[in-house]
Swiss-Prot record:
This is V-type proton ATPase subunit E1. The lineage of its organism: Eukaryota, Viridiplantae, Streptophyta, Embryophyta, Tracheophyta. V-ATPase is a heteromultimeric enzyme composed of a peripheral catalytic V1 complex (components A to H) attached to an integral membrane V0 proton pore complex (components: a, c, c'', d and e). Residues 8-67 form a coiled coil. Disulfide bonds: none annotated. InterPro entries: ATPase_E_C, ATPase_V1_Esu. It comes from Arabidopsis thaliana. Subunit of the peripheral V1 complex of vacuolar ATPase essential for assembly or catalytic function. V-ATPase is responsible for acidifying a variety of intracellular compartments in eukaryotic cells. Required for Golgi organization and vacuole function in embryogenesis. It is found in: Vacuole membrane. Belongs to the V-ATPase E subunit family. The modification Phosphoserine is found at residue 178. HAMAP family: ATP_synth_E_arch (MF_00311).
Length: 230
């Protein structure tokens, strides 16, 4: 083999090695590009997923805020309705309290009422000796009916007539004044207590109005508003 043949063989080997290297490099390049595209696609999908999750989270938060706002508005409206209902009911009670003043103006009827109130207290206390307090302006009426009240109680309770001491030093408050309707006052009635003061029966017109109003409040609300509310 001469030098020319050797040179040609070497050139062929070089071309073969170069071609093989180029093919291998091309394969590596294609593979790398495929891996890059796959990784890029995965990153894009991951970012899309994150964006969707963030959007869903914000959407849920917005829904929660809407529900909270609606609940607060609904509660505020309910409070306003209840307040308006309370105002109406309290206005009725205030008017009833004003009407109580008319009770004592009918002397004959009020005198009979005082006797009945005294008898009720005596039946509740069931004490042989009690202290009675009334308004100073009612003192004469109370003293006028006291004996009859004691006898009526004794007949109903089947006991001896009790000793009833009328307090002429400390009286119940006077009727409410027009310039101070919410000051300390009493529209009429009596308060009886055991002599040791441990048992008290408050039978004033104001106290009876409070009790009656409290007991009838559900009925009043239902009659006015069509439902019973707390």
């Amino acid at each position: 083999m001469n030098d020319g043949d050797v040179s040609r063989q070497i050139q062929q080997m070089v071309r073969f090695i170069r071609q093989e290297a180029e093919e291998k490099a091309n394969e590596i390049s294609v593979s790398a590009e495929e891996e890059f595209n796959i990784e890029k696609l995965q990153l894009v999908e991951a970012e899309k997923k994150k964006i969707r999750q963030d959007y869903e989270k914000k959407e849920k938060q917005a829904d929660v805020r809407k529900k909270i706002d609606y609940s607060m508005q609904l509660n505020a409206s309910r409070i306003k309705v209840l307040q308006a209902q309370d105002d109406i009911v309290n206005a009725m009670k205030d008017q009833a309290a004003k009407d109580l003043l008319n009770v004592s103006r009918d002397e004959y009827a009020y005198k009979q009422l005082l006797k009945d109130l005294i008898v009720q207290c005596l039946l509740r206390l069931k004490e042989p000796s009690v202290l009675l307090r009334c308004r100073e302006e009612d003192l004469g009426l109370v003293e006028a009916v006291l004996d009859d009240a004691k006898e009526e109680y004794a007949g109903k309770a089947k006991v001896h007539a009790p000793e009833v001491a009328v307090d002429t030093k400390i009286f119940l408050p006077p009727p409410p004044k027009s310039n101070d309707p919410h000051g300390l006052h009493c529209s009429g009635g009596v308060v009886l207590a055991s002599r040791d003061g441990k048992i008290v029966c408050e039978n004033t017109l104001d106290a009876r109005l409070d009790v009656a109003f409290r007991m009838k409040l559900p009925v009043i609300r239902k009659s006015l508003f069509g439902q019973v509310t707390a």
